[in-house]
């Protein structure tokens, strides 16, 4: 019988072992030895937990220049992401990509709904004239969904501010022929042009009003802050927002045909933050040309290209200017590419190989498809830097997320 070792030497013994338990990620994902692995083809060995869960940060790069607080996005499918899902994905620290299975105008309209849900400084507020009737003001409430409007001397933006009208001013007025100037709040509290967003929010807290109107030195209306946006900030402090406008971040998908160029123009005009080039095979001359055109036409727009499953595919898209990659072929909830075309790659191997390559160029990746159970997240995240793009998994949880 072997001698019993001193328990104090247990750690020293592990250091002298020829190799640690299990396989390294490089050994596990060696395609020459193991071919391709799906998520349920392996398990992750446990290790030492020497930190509290509160110390864990899920902050992850979506693209070269966009960072979110959670590594979750919703897929650009017509059964998954429209304006409501995109709004709540952004509020809950992720991002949603609005599908393009609709007219360009309808897609741009969905985009505007997301963008208008929350604002920083509202630089193009809807204003009315002092000679507008109460009846017309009530109609504007029904049209826009709110009843608070700045009143300027000529009813135009960037004109002399003469008052403000709210729902309280007109709620009990029965004579709809009265003019706004007869019922409006005169001399509303204002902020001076140049105040910061945080300074403006502090004023809103003190005055306990629905809006803060910002004017220049001549008293002309410049912009506006809304109390409802302040309340949204308190409820969703980590919401995904544009660094410039403080509006919610959102993305959208387009195809790679010439007709998609005009669609993209409409989306950019509506405030697009990041675009997905939606294709099951991203390594095509059509997508490469589209990436180059976008970079020339809209150099500040972030592009997520794909889908890819190999390093060679990734290399072409990175060289063309992609700011992020989407990984997966035949692994989505309704995708049948592998069965019909005998083309694709098991998602575990695809994710590791593409991420390992793309990370060398600072290009983040997202795994698209293959999530069947909650533990699939852990498989996706080992040794890699990327997001999870969910489609069918989200559909059954839609009301839980958005309600």
Curated annotation (Swiss-Prot):
<feature type="active site" description="Thioimidate intermediate">
    <location>
        <position position="335"/>
    </location>
</feature>
<keyword id="KW-0963">Cytoplasm</keyword>
<comment type="pathway">
    <text>Purine metabolism; XMP biosynthesis via de novo pathway; XMP from IMP: step 1/1.</text>
</comment>
<feature type="domain" description="CBS 2">
    <location>
        <begin position="184"/>
        <end position="240"/>
    </location>
</feature>
<keyword id="KW-0677">Repeat</keyword>
<dbReference type="GO" id="GO:0005737">
    <property type="term" value="C:cytoplasm"/>
</dbReference>
<dbReference type="Pfam" id="PF00478">
    <property type="entry name" value="IMPDH"/>
</dbReference>
<dbReference type="InterPro" id="IPR046342">
    <property type="entry name" value="CBS_dom_sf"/>
</dbReference>
<keyword id="KW-0332">GMP biosynthesis</keyword>
<keyword id="KW-0520">NAD</keyword>
<keyword id="KW-0479">Metal-binding</keyword>
<dbReference type="Pfam" id="PF00571">
    <property type="entry name" value="CBS"/>
</dbReference>
<dbReference type="InterPro" id="IPR013785">
    <property type="entry name" value="Aldolase_TIM"/>
</dbReference>
<dbReference type="InterPro" id="IPR000644">
    <property type="entry name" value="CBS_dom"/>
</dbReference>
<protein>
    <recommendedName>
        <fullName>Putative inosine-5'-monophosphate dehydrogenase 1</fullName>
        <ecNumber>1.1.1.205</ecNumber>
    </recommendedName>
</protein>
<comment type="similarity">
    <text>Belongs to the IMPDH/GMPR family.</text>
</comment>
<feature type="binding site">
    <location>
        <position position="332"/>
    </location>
    <ligand>
        <name>K(+)</name>
    </ligand>
</feature>
<comment type="subunit">
    <text>Homotetramer.</text>
</comment>
<feature type="binding site">
    <location>
        <position position="333"/>
    </location>
    <ligand>
        <name>IMP</name>
    </ligand>
</feature>
<dbReference type="InterPro" id="IPR005990">
    <property type="entry name" value="IMP_DH"/>
</dbReference>
<dbReference type="GO" id="GO:0046872">
    <property type="term" value="F:metal ion binding"/>
</dbReference>
<feature type="binding site">
    <location>
        <begin position="368"/>
        <end position="370"/>
    </location>
    <ligand>
        <name>IMP</name>
    </ligand>
</feature>
<keyword id="KW-0658">Purine biosynthesis</keyword>
<feature type="domain" description="CBS 1">
    <location>
        <begin position="121"/>
        <end position="183"/>
    </location>
</feature>
<dbReference type="GO" id="GO:0003938">
    <property type="term" value="F:IMP dehydrogenase activity"/>
</dbReference>
<dbReference type="InterPro" id="IPR015875">
    <property type="entry name" value="IMP_DH/GMP_Rdtase_CS"/>
</dbReference>
<keyword id="KW-0630">Potassium</keyword>
<dbReference type="InterPro" id="IPR001093">
    <property type="entry name" value="IMP_DH_GMPRt"/>
</dbReference>
<feature type="binding site">
    <location>
        <position position="330"/>
    </location>
    <ligand>
        <name>K(+)</name>
    </ligand>
</feature>
<keyword id="KW-0129">CBS domain</keyword>
<feature type="binding site">
    <location>
        <begin position="278"/>
        <end position="280"/>
    </location>
    <ligand>
        <name>NAD(+)</name>
    </ligand>
</feature>
<feature type="binding site">
    <location>
        <begin position="328"/>
        <end position="330"/>
    </location>
    <ligand>
        <name>NAD(+)</name>
    </ligand>
</feature>
<keyword id="KW-0560">Oxidoreductase</keyword>
<feature type="binding site">
    <location>
        <position position="335"/>
    </location>
    <ligand>
        <name>K(+)</name>
    </ligand>
</feature>
<dbReference type="GO" id="GO:0006177">
    <property type="term" value="P:GMP biosynthetic process"/>
</dbReference>
